[in-house]
């Protein structure tokens, strides 16, 4: 860990539309098995993760969180699954600052420079921004859509955990969406596992 950080979690549940999409996935899995082409667990998890990453009420919950934590929109990156989700998140962000940009494809250098020099407050971006980005002044990361791979989460968190020589007392913020469900079938161990290890990291303090 490079600098101290606060870990904020936003619990979310599936909407009726999300649940319908999950039922369709299990129906497709059953149909494939009947046809003699059973899915592997990886295929099933991948399909279910698409619903989790793009859960319908995430933009609304993000808006609710930002309304109580307006300062966190500044010096931040919002990681989303794709352009479709990104546009919904961007609409929420626009309610708190008009100094933001979106990045979904191409080269990120221009946007990274704008963020690092303070020309924009926030950047809504997809997974292409995971690696090779060094913005020492960056303070906040929003994990809107997070894959199961721990390495990807570490890379994303690393964007805001760099030591800033111009702000030696820097304390970053990691905001994460965690699935909460009463339905055992819909529970995602990946979210709970991620929450546990990030919480342990957040407890570490610099000496």
Q: Which residues does each PLM region occupy?
A:
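Alpha-helical elements of the RecA-like P-loop NTPase motor core of helicases
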Residues: 60, 87, 91, 113, ...
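Conserved helicase motor "Helicase C" RecA-like lobe of SF1/SF2 P-loop NTPases
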Residues: 79-104
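Conserved RecA-like P-loop NTPase helicase motor core
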Residues: 99-206
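Interdomain helical connector at the RecA1-RecA2 junction of SF1/SF2 helicase-like NTPases
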Residues: 1-73
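Conserved catalytic network of the ASCE P-loop NTPase/AAA+ motor domain
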Residues: 1-2, 68-71, 94, 114-118, ...
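Residue-level preference for the first positions of well-ordered beta-strands
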Residues: 75-77, 121-122
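Hydrophobic packing residues within well-ordered alpha-helices of enzyme cores
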Residues: 22, 89-93, 132
């Amino acid at each position: 860990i490079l600098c101290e950080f606060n870990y904020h979690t936003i619990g979310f549940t599936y909407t009726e539309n999300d649940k319908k999409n999950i039922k369709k996935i299990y129906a497709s899995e059953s149909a494939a098995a009947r046809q003699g082409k059973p899915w592997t667990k990886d295929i099933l998890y991948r399909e279910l993760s698409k619903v989790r990453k793009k859960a319908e009420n995430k933009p609304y919950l993000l808006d609710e969180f930002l309304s109580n934590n307006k300062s966190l929109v500044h010096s931040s990156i919002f990681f989303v699954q794709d352009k479709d989700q990104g546009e919904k998140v961007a609409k929420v962000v626009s309610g708190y600052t008009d100094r933001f940009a979106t990045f979904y494809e191409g080269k990120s250098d221009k946007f990274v420079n704008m963020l690092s020099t303070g020309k924009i407050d926030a950047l809504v971006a997809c997974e292409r921004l995971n690696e090779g980005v060094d913005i020492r002044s960056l303070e906040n990361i929003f994990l809107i859509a997070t894959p199961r791979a721990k390495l990807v989460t570490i890379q994303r968190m690393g964007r805001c955990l760099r030591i800033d020589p111009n702000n030696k007392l820097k304390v970053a913020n990691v905001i994460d969406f965690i699935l909460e469900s009463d339905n055992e079938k819909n529970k995602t161990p990946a979210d709970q596992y991620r929450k546990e290890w990030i919480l342990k990291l957040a407890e570490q303090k610099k000496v």
